Curated annotation (Swiss-Prot):
Name of the gene encoding the protein in the UniProt record: asnS
Name of the featured protein: Asparagine--tRNA ligase
Top-rank EC class of the record's enzyme: ligase
Keyword annotations from UniProtKB, A to Z: Aminoacyl-tRNA synthetase, ATP-binding, Cytoplasm, Ligase, Nucleotide-binding, Protein biosynthesis
Reactions listed under catalytic activity: tRNA(Asn) + L-asparagine + ATP = L-asparaginyl-tRNA(Asn) + AMP + diphosphate + H(+)
Length: 429
């Protein structure tokens, strides 16, 4: 048994091949039934001729519905009029399940397709999305393995919030209130003292009532923490990682990108170095293009979208005002009102995909910032301990994998980038 991609080659022309899959399209004309079969590797046109099969066989195969499953044996030949240039003339077949009417047609609305995502995943478009997504995740891990990082695992249920409690999902844990994790950062920081360079890929949960095209309540988060490097060096790592992923996707999923309408060559142009622009300068850029922003305003989705339209590559926005960022980011020695951080904004209006920074490693500085933020010191005792025993300079970042996938594939909505999106209005299927 061959995959459709394996069978559809010059080497098999004139030979008998066996393939299996699902009916993608079917029509009959003049005693010939044309069936396009799909599997995970592609599609191939097959023909069943009435004069070469028994009446019962022809009636069975010509009456199959979309997404009926079958295996078949036939002769492979070249056929320039077929979708792929190859065609199988069917000799034998076995039907595993015959469908009548498949619920999804070409003219279904977005909400209907979300309600039936378990079936819509079979579409050629979504098959390509899943393949590209797989390459993105695998490439992220490969990049860091090649750089000597260790993959580690952290808990999903936590008692301490990384970035405040207003958007946490609260869970009753045997009578004790705990939360679904928003970031693995603190736990990753504990591991740099043994492994030095660590990363993880895991779901994160955010109880934000956002209805934008780039927000999910459950999303895939790739995070890394590294000992002995500063904010600038962390950005070096990130831009090389992003370009490595892009190169792998182009190499392994060129046809998938084309099917999705994404120009692979436009992606290939995203070569480092990426521009690095201070927040204060970004505010100036924003006002030049007509936005009413002042220093100290946070950049929302609309501001990021308009700003990134000015750049042909991802852009790092650095040195945010201290008040806009979490307590664990250190102040810039040259300008204490700013912190040593960075956000990476994807071009073409896609906005933030990475948030990262140097981390405060000095015990006294950390304690001061915790108190300034009005946080309960006892809740962070174990995080504080890291600064008491052999603390070192270190940096880290978090990457929204679904946002990265959305940008790489040039999708309109983040819900298209993940198999089963979870939003404030959707928990099924």
């Amino acid at each position: 048994m061959l995959s459709i991609a394996e069978a559809s080659s010059e080497a098999h022309v004139g030979s008998e091949v066996s393939v299996r899959g699902w009916v993608y399209r079917i029509r009959s004309s003049g005693g010939v039934t044309f069936i396009v079969i799909r599997d995970s590797t592609g599609i191939v046109q097959c023909t069943a001729k009435k004069n070469e099969l028994t009446p019962e066989q022809y009636d069975e195969i010509s009456s199959l519905g979309i997404e009926s499953s079958l295996s078949l044996i036939g002769t492979m030949k070249k056929e320039p009029r077929s979708p792929t240039g190859y065609e199988i003339s069917i000799h034998k077949f076995t039907v595993y399940q015959k469908n009548d009417v498949f619920p999804i047609t070409k003219d279904q609305g977005e909400e209907f397709l979300l309600d039936n995502r378990h079936l819509w995943l079979r579409s050629r478009e979504f098959t390509s999305i899943l393949k590209v997504r797989s390459t993105i995740f695998r490439s992220f891990a490969d990049f860091f393995y090649d750089q000597g990082y260790y993959q580690v695992h952290t808990p999903f249920m936590v008692s301490t919030a990384v970035e405040g409690g207003s958007t946490l999902f609260k869970v009753d844990f045997f009578g004790e209130p705990i939360f679904l994790n928003q970031s693995a950062q603190f736990y990753l920081e504990t591991m740099i003292y043994s492994l030095e360079k660590v990363f993880t890929i895991a779901p994160s949960f955010r109880a934000e009532k956002s209805r934008t095209r780039r927000h999910l309540t459950e999303y895939w988060h790739a995070e890394a923490e590294v000992a002995w490097i500063d904010n600038r060096e962390m950005m070096d790592v990130e831009e090389n990682m992003i370009y490595y992923i892009i190169q792998r996707v182009i190499e392994e999923n060129y046809d998938d990108l084309k099917l999705l309408g994404r120009d692979p060559e436009a992606l290939r142009a995203m070569k480092p170095p990426f521009p690095r622009v201070k927040y204060s300068d970004i505010i100036k850029v924003a006002n030049e293009i007509g936005m009413q922003l002042k220093y100290g305003d946070d950049l929302g989705a609309d501001e990021e979208r308009q700003i990134t339209m000015r750049y042909c590559k991802p852009v790092f926005v650095t040195n945010y005002p201290k008040e806009l960022k979490p307590f664990y980011m250190p102040q810039d020695p040259d300008n204490p009102s700013e912190v040593l951080n960075h956000d990476l904004l994807a071009p073409e209006g896609y906005g933030e995909i990475i948030g990262g920074s140097q981390r405060i490693w000095d015990y006294k500085e950390l304690m001061q910032r915790i108190r300034e933020a009005g946080l309960d010191e006892s809740a962070y005792y174990w995080y504080i301990d890291l600064r008491k025993y052999g603390s070192v300079p270190h940096s880290g970042f978090g990457l929204g994998m679904d946002r990265l996938a959305m940008w790489i594939m040039h999708l309109d909505n983040i819900r298209e980038a993940i198999p089963y999106p979870r939003t404030i209005r959707r928990t099924k299927p």
